[in-house]
Amino acid sequence: MPASHQRSMTFPAGKDEVFQACVKAVSQCGFRIVESNPEAAQIEARTRMGMRSWGENITIIIGADGRADIKSSCRGIQVIDYGKNKANVNALFSALGLLLPSPPQQ
C-alpha cells in the first residue's frame, strides 16, 4: 500500500465557497487538477515527480458543513514518502487558511 497522509478541517463557510477555495489552493500550491466535480464537491489533483518521489495523488472531498477532507498518497508502489504527503496536505490547508475565514479555535 502506498504511503499517505490525511487530515480534515471544518471552515465556517458553505460547501460551494470551500470548494472554490480548494480549487484556488490546489493551483497556488503548484498542483494540477485532473478532475473537478462541483456537484459532488470532489477534486482530484496530482503533484509533479521530484527527486524523492514519483509524485502524489491528492483527493479533496468537501462536506455540506464546510468540512474539507484532504488526502495525499504516493503514486505507484512507493512505500516511503519522506514526509512529502504530510507537506502536501499542510500546504493546502495553509493556502485555504488564507482564502477562507479561520475555523474556530478548539
What residue spans do the PLM features occupy?
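Ser/Thr-rich, low-complexity intrinsically disordered terminal regions
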Residues: 1-106
